[in-house]
Amino acid sequence: MSRIGRLPITIPAGVDVTIDGDRVSVKGPKGPKGQLEHSLPTPITATLEEGQVTVARPDDERESRSLHGLTRTLISNMVEGVTNGFSKQLEVVGTGYRVQAKGQDLEFDLGYSHPVPVKVSQGITFTVEGNRVTVAGIDKQQQVGETAANIRKLRRPDPYKGKGVYAGEQIRRKAGKK
């Protein structure tokens, strides 16, 4: 049995979990769109009993074992997302590098000949404080992490000067010419 998969997911107050066949829906207090859905993989089943969701698998095949822990973690992240939400912080570092909020979207000046716009996707909010950008939302695995990764990809950290967009990372600096 998977060590992660066998743990039950406790449902906090104010969160409504619905299991309909192979679909798991989670509704919560986080915003008007505080609902997430997940389709269960074929061999995996989920049951709702006494305020807890339990994920089970029918056999010990390799694919079933790997999907067991994954499914339990995805459902747990959905419950966490609709109650507290997720956020990632990014920092813009470099001379002349800046970020500005244009309505709900962002505009980066990253040393290119043109400003780089970033459109907000549905369910994501941006907060700009100086050179820090906070990406927040309820869907961890897709929206928040992917949006933060796409913003970081605009200007990856430079190993020589440490300039770029990154999130609290320790940049491994290289020595320049001698």
Curated annotation (Swiss-Prot):
GO terms for molecular function: rRNA binding; structural constituent of ribosome. Keywords: Ribonucleoprotein, Ribosomal protein, RNA-binding, rRNA-binding. Belongs to the universal ribosomal protein uL6 family. GO terms for biological process: cytoplasmic translation. Gene3D superfamilies: Ribosomal protein L6, alpha-beta domain (3.90.930.12). It holds the Pfam family Ribosomal_L6. Transmembrane segments: none annotated. It comes from Micrococcus luteus. GO terms for cellular component: cytosolic large ribosomal subunit. It comes from the Bacteria. This protein binds to the 23S rRNA, and is important in its secondary structure. It is located near the subunit interface in the base of the L7/L12 stalk, and near the tRNA binding site of the peptidyltransferase center. Part of the 50S ribosomal subunit. NCBIfam families: L6_bact. This is Large ribosomal subunit protein uL6.
